[in-house]
Curated annotation (Swiss-Prot):
Name the UniProt record assigns to this protein: Undifferentiated embryonic cell transcription factor 1
Native organism taxonomy: Eukaryota, Metazoa, Chordata, Craniata, Vertebrata
Positions where Phosphoserine occurs in the chain: 18, 21, 54
Stretches the record annotates as Disordered: 1-62, 146-273
Keyword set, alphabetical order: Activator, Nucleus, Phosphoprotein, Transcription, Transcription regulation
Amino acid sequence: MLLRPRRPPPLAPPAPPSPASPDPEPRTPGDAPGTPPRRPASPSALGELGLPVSPGSAQRTPWSARETELLLGTLLQPAVWRALLLDRRQALPTYRRVSAALAQQQVRRTPAQCRRRYKFLKDKFREAHGQPPGPFDEQIRKLMGLLGDNGRKRPRRRSPGSGRPQRARRPVPNAHAPAPSEPDATPLPTARDRDADPTWTLRFSPSPPKSADASPAPGSPPAPAPTALATCIPEDRAPVRGPGSPPPPPAREDPDSPPGRPEDCAPPPAAPPSLNTALLQTLGHLGDIANILGPLRDQLLTLNQHVEQLRGAFDQTVSLAVGFILGSAAAERGVLRDPCQ
C-alpha cells in the first residue's frame, strides 16, 4: 500500500497593516512570509535607475515651495512637455520620468502626486480672478501655453459603476397640478375620486357638470373623458365609415341656419390652373424653342451662301474646261489656220 505524502500546513494570512504605517511596502512574489523585509533603496539609487520614488511618508506630506518650483522646472523641459503634449492619455510614463528627476534632487514624490500637483496648480490659476499674483503664476502660464491648457476647466465625467447606485428619474409633474412650493396650493382630486370638489369640476372641466338626476346607472360603463380632439369636432359630424361602405347622402343645408364659422369648415382644395396660366406656360416654352432655333437658322443661311459660292465657282470651272477642250479640238483640225495659206 502506497502512502501519500503529507501536505504542508496552510500558510497563515498576512497580518493587516497597522494604522501607524498607512502605506506599507508591497512584497514581491518571491519573498517568503517569514523573511525580513528588504532594505529600501536610496532615492539617489532609484534616480540613477530611472525608477519613480514612492515612499509611504510622502503620500500626505504637503508640497513645499522648493518642491513645486522643481516640479514646474522639470515640466518646462522641452523633452518633458513635448512628451506630455504628444500623448495626453498615456501621461503616466512621462510623470515617472519627472518623479525620477525629482528624486535626483532629493524630492521624493510619486508620479501620481506630480500629476495631481500640476492639475491643482492649473485649476487654482484658472480660478484666481482679481487676486494678487502668486510666486509660480508665470511658470504655470508658460506651461499651460505649451500644453494647450488655456481653455476653461472641463467638468469631470463619472460613469455610474456597479458600486454606485443610479439615480432614479424624477416623475414628470402634471401640467394641471399646482407647484409644491406654493403655500396656498391645494392638491387636485383624482379622476376616480367620487367626493371631488364641485368647484374644481366646474373650473377645470370643459363641459358643465350634470345634475344628480342625470347620473348614470351603477352597471353602465363610465363615459369617456372629453379630449381636445373631441371639442374641435362638431357634434353633428357623420361617423367614420369604412372603405367598403357606401358614401353618405349629401346633407341639405338649411337656408335659415346661420353660416358656419371658418374654423369649423375644412379648407377648400387648391383650384386647378386656369387656361390663361396654361397658355402663358406654352408661350414660354415656344419662346425657348425660338431662342434655340434662331442660331440654327443663322447657320443654315451661312451654309446656303457657301453653297452659292461653290456653285458659281463650279460653273466658271466648267466653262473654262469646255472652252479649253473646244480650242484644242479646233487647233487639231486646222480650223484656226491662216486663211492666206
